[in-house]
């Protein structure tokens, strides 16, 4: 009797999807996911490293699947949007900052001052300290208020104010979109700075995230590419040849930072505390001081990768001009000294997810009212480059892009990883993390409503995690910076993350199937709802 009751109880607990979306929903099958992911993470694709042969195979495979599904090419008459890249190695010895005060100069390099900038540039100017480098009108906070950064070098803290304060006007123990150094670099550029210099936030004990360093494999990435020492191949840095920042970002060590504050008669920790008290900016010019900077590179080459994009046009004459996006990234880490970095979970799983949903929506007789763009980004492991390029060169207008569902690592169960500090539930076999829903309660409510059919265990813990700074570490972040509700769907870290052991036999295909069914239902609701989910600028995780 017990065995008969369990299926009946499950049927009561989880409703069936509406008949109008049933065909596409039923087409999402674990067997297809396994076949596709087995290919995408196979030795033949050589780890899909950006600008190498394996990534080109992945690009062509994704495009061919979009064509088989009958998607409309989204990049003119092609599925491929070129992403112009510069690959280079930063010269740690010739990349320098020279600080001059009272006629005395000191040149900093290496561990004291580093940068990874694609162009070889030099310049000099006065120095201003601009707090955390944040301009947030909705929070009534502007570190640039009262200072003139034009033609100057701007020094800032990493992170954001009140990170340990649950009552913060920012996001307390989580992050807002302003804590990322790539945002701060563009903000400094908008204020006329000629270079940005970041230093460790003296009030934050976590790792210095999101700061490109000379020779770093993932500039601006926020550390998501970190791996165990010696295990990961040494990979040249990549940057956008078009659409990236035009000024360099330097990171300086504690000794150099303390010296600059000493010139101003201040201590960094005291200034940090003063900002936190209100919070209010405490910016100032560092008197009688100039910095001369120089960046240098080697092994520089220009090449294109590609975002792969296909479209299902909406069925509603008015709403089809609006867009719902499903995204992932296809690139990984290539071949290292220990073998091939297969990237089954990261991010073969997300790539297969987007392709699977393209087939599901195409197979469903009833089409969504809004148009749906399926896009798989290039060079995410190199700094979200494909996504950043897209938002500066959109294939569909950003103003009418309503929402993004971004898949990155949706195939595993979260397990303890010594590189990641987080609390883990005793059972993660049915768990899905949603990162960034604190910016859109409407988004969260939609997914939770559709989850009544699927029955996953949803967690929002990463929105309260300033330490690992996951908000900035996948392709939804550039959309969030353009006020588009973008959420990263993520099943969590594990010891195989960025290791050669991230292989297909470890994927939980049953859970991955449920995640894609939930995304399908959520995507349909986003596409058919009277209005899109609203972005809440004053984000606060609960």
Predicted regions mapped to residue ranges:
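Extracellular/luminal Protease-associated
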Residues: 107-248, 313, 341-342, 346, ...
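Metal-dependent peptidase/peptidase-like ectodomains
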Residues: 104-110, 119-120, 145, 151, ...
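N-terminal hydrophobic or amphipathic helices/low-complexity stretches enriched
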Residues: 15-74, 256, 321-323, 536
């Amino acid at each position: 009797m017990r065995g008969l009751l369990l299926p009946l109880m499950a049927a009561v607990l989880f409703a069936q999807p509406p008949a109008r979306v049933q065909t596409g929903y039923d087409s999402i099958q674990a067997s297809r996911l396994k076949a596709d992911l087995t290919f995408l993470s196979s030795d033949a694709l050589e780890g899909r490293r950006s600008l190498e042969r394996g990534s080109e195979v992945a690009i062509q495979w994704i495009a061919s699947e979009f064509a088989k599904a009958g998607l409309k090419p989204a990049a003119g008459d092609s599925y491929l949007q070129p992403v112009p890249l510069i690959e280079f190695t930063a010269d740690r010895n010739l990349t320098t900052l020279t600080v001059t005060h009272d006629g005395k100069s000191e040149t900093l390099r290496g561990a004291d001052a580093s940068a990874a900038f694609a162009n070889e540039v030099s310049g000099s100017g006065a120095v201003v300290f601009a707090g955390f480098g944040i301009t947030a009108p909705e929070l009534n906070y502007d570190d640039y208020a009262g200072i003139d950064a034009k033609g100057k070098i701007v020094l800032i803290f990493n992170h954001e104010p009140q990170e340990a304060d649950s009552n913060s006007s920012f996001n307390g123990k989580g992050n807002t979109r302003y804590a990322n150094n790539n945002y701060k670099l563009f903000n400094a550029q908008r204020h006329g700075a000629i270079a940005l210099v970041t230093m460790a936030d003296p009030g934050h004990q976590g790792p210095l995230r999101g700061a490109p360093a000379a020779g770093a494999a993932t500039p601006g990435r926020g550390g998501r590419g970190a791996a165990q020492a010696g295990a990961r191949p040494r990979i040249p840095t990549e940057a956008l040849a078009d659409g990236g920042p035009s000024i360099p970002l330097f990171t300086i060590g504690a000794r150099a930072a303390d010296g600059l504050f000493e010139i101003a008669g201040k201590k960094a920790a005291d200034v940090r505390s003063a900002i936190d008290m209100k919070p209010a900016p405490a910016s100032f010019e560092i008197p009688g001081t100039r910095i001369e900077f120089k960046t240098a590179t080697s092994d520089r080459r220009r090449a294109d990768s590609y975002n792969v994009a296909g479209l299902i046009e909406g069925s509603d004459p008015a709403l089809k001009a609006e867009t719902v996006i499903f995204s992932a990234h296809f690139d990984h880490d290539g071949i290292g000294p220990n073998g091939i970095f297969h990237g089954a979970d990261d991010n073969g799983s997300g790539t297969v997810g987007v392709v699977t949903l393209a087939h599901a929506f195409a197979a469903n007789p009833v089409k969504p009212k809004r148009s749906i763009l399926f896009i798989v980004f290039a060079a995410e492991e190199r700094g979200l480059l494909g996504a950043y390029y897209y938002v500066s060169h959109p294939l569909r207008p950003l103003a009418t892009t309503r929402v993004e569902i971004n898949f990155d690592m949706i195939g595993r169960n979260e397990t303890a990883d010594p590189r990641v500090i987080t609390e883990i539930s005793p059972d993660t076999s049915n768990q899905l993390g949603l990162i960034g829903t604190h910016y859109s309660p409407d988004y969260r409510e939609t997914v939770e409503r559709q989850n009544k059919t699927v029955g996953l265990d949803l967690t929002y813990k990463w929105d309260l995690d300033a330490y690992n700074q996951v908000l900035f570490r996948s392709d939804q972040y550039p959309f969030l910076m353009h006020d588009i509700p973008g959420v990263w769907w993520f099943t969590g870290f594990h010891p195989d993350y960025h290791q050669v052991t991230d292989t297909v036999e470890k994927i939980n295909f049953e859970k991955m199937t449920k995640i894609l069914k939930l995304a399908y239902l959520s995507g349909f609701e986003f596409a058919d709802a009277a209005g899109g989910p609203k972005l809440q600028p004053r984000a606060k995780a609960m």
